[in-house]
UniProtKB/Swiss-Prot annotation:
Protein name: Succinyl-diaminopimelate desuccinylase 2
NCBIfam families named among the record's database cross-references: dapE_proteo, PRK13009.1
Gene that encodes the chain: dapE2
Keyword Hydrolase: yes
Residues where Zn(2+) 2 binds: 95, 130, 350
Needed cofactors: Zn(2+); Co(2+)
Function: Catalyzes the hydrolysis of N-succinyl-L,L-diaminopimelic acid (SDAP), forming succinate and LL-2,6-diaminopimelate (DAP), an intermediate involved in the bacterial biosynthesis of lysine and meso-diaminopimelic acid, an essential component of bacterial cell walls.
Key word Nucleus present: no
Enzymatic reactions: N-succinyl-(2S,6S)-2,6-diaminopimelate + H2O = (2S,6S)-2,6-diaminopimelate + succinate
Enzyme Commission numbers on file: 3.5.1.18
Length: 377
């Protein structure tokens, strides 16, 4: 609990780190880790491991948090890390400073009980997860790949649980990509429609065509692909003017069965099929995020190991899920690295009065302790 509050009291609003990683690094050095700090365009990153071998197990997380919002709506100051009636309240209580603190405490106590593991362990920490995520985990993974030091297994402390720590784990995430589509018509007077080209009518055709696209329906452990229009703008409203331009924004969440290039090609083919004219459509893609999916190959898979640790502590198995938004798991996952996300109940993430029960922090700590014993050798 002391570690949770130590991190939460540092106002590390993305991409600021506010000294969190310096404090983490000092604790890790005391345990025998070799720690490296990196700064990249205002982002703080940390890599720690026992030696230069590729890690058997990596523990990953982020020190940055989202802004607290309206301070007057908080029950307690958002960076005071206040304890009230068995709850820890403050920004980062769930997402994800308590998760990082649990990882740190679990490793520290494991070493105190069993000594240093024979396997190499690793910490991968960034302050650029809640923001653009361009200069954080992505760059750390690139550094490890260049050194042939990608970990075999990686557990991310993202808040994945529903009601109790360990009841849900993430075994992947859908990919995501946004698009900004501009349609060019011809402005005119509504009384003379033959002299105008209504860009909103063009937009209606486009949206109807996009909605009619058939995607995969998903599976038991992976939601299907979904396209949602998020914004339509035809400029300032005047009821006697035919709009000459219109902007449509949409977002696609897609399964690992698709590639980003495949998604783009399918949307372009759909637009080309409308024959609106080459100069009538301008399409710009934004904020692409790749999907990832970890599969259970055998008894030594990371899923099996995490399930066994959870069962040891809770006497129940977790639900395997890929729901929710994107995470840094997409950067960590590779043919060399299996990734699982395991954390606290996520009901209050990014909310005013973000909070977590102390009992859930203890429960998650016990799960991580059980997991670490499986990677000692």
């Amino acid at each position: 609990m002391r570690y949770c509050r130590e991190l939460m009291r540092r106002p590390s609003i993305t991409p600021e780190d506010a000294g969190c990683q310096q404090w983490l690094g000092e604790r890790l050095v005391a345990m025998g880790f070799d720690v490296s700090h990196y700064q990249d365009k205002g982002v703080s990153n940390l890599l720690a491991s026992f030696d230069e071998r590729p890690a058997q197990l990596a523990l990953a997380g982020h020190t940055d948090v989202v802004p607290p919002g309206d301070l007057s709506r908080w029950q307690t100051p958002p960076f005071a890390a206040t304890l009230v009636d068995g709850m820890l309240i403050g920004r980062g209580a769930v997402d994800m400073k308590s998760g990082l603190a649990v990882m740190l405490a679990a490793v520290e106590d494991h070493i105190a009980c069993y000594g240093l593991p024979k396997a190499n362990w690793q910490f991968i920490v960034t302050s650029d997860e809640e923001g653009e995520a361009e200069h954080g985990t992505r760059t750390l993974v690139e550094r490890l790949k260049a050194q042939s030091r990608l970990p075999k297994y990686c557990v991310v402390a993202e808040p994945t649980a529903d009601k109790q720590a360990g009841d849900v784990i993430k075994i992947g995430r859908r990919g995501a990509i946004s698009a900004r589509l501009t349609l060019k018509g011809k402005q005119g007077h509504v009384a003379y429609p033959k002299n105008a080209v209504n860009a909103l009518h063009m937009a209606a055709r486009v949206m109807q065509a996009l909605e009619a696209l058939i995607w995969d329906e998903g599976s038991d452990d992976f939601p299907g692909t979904s396209l949602q229009v998020t914004h339509v703008d035809s400029g300032a409203f005047t009821d006697n003017i035919v709009p000459g331009s219109c902007e449509i924004c949409f977002n696609i969440r897609y399964s690992y069965r698709y590639s980003e290039a495949g998604i783009m090609a399918r949307i372009q083919a759909c637009l080309d099929g409308l024959s609106l004219g080459e100069d009538a459509i301008s399409l710009r893609w934004e904020r692409g995020c790749q999907p990832y999916h970890t599969q259970e190959n055998d008894e030594q898979s990371l899923i099996a190991q995490v399930e066994a640790a959870i069962f040891e502590v809770t006497a129940s198995f977790p639900r395997l899920s890929t729901s929710g938004g994107t995470s840094d798991g997409r950067f960590l996952s590779s043919p060399q690295t299996q990734v699982i996300e395991l954390g606290l109940p996520n009901r209050t993430i990014h909310q005013v009065n973000e909070r977590v029960e102390l009992a859930q922090i203890v429960r998650l700590y016990r799960i991580y302790r059980a997991l670490l014993t499986r990677f000692h050798d």
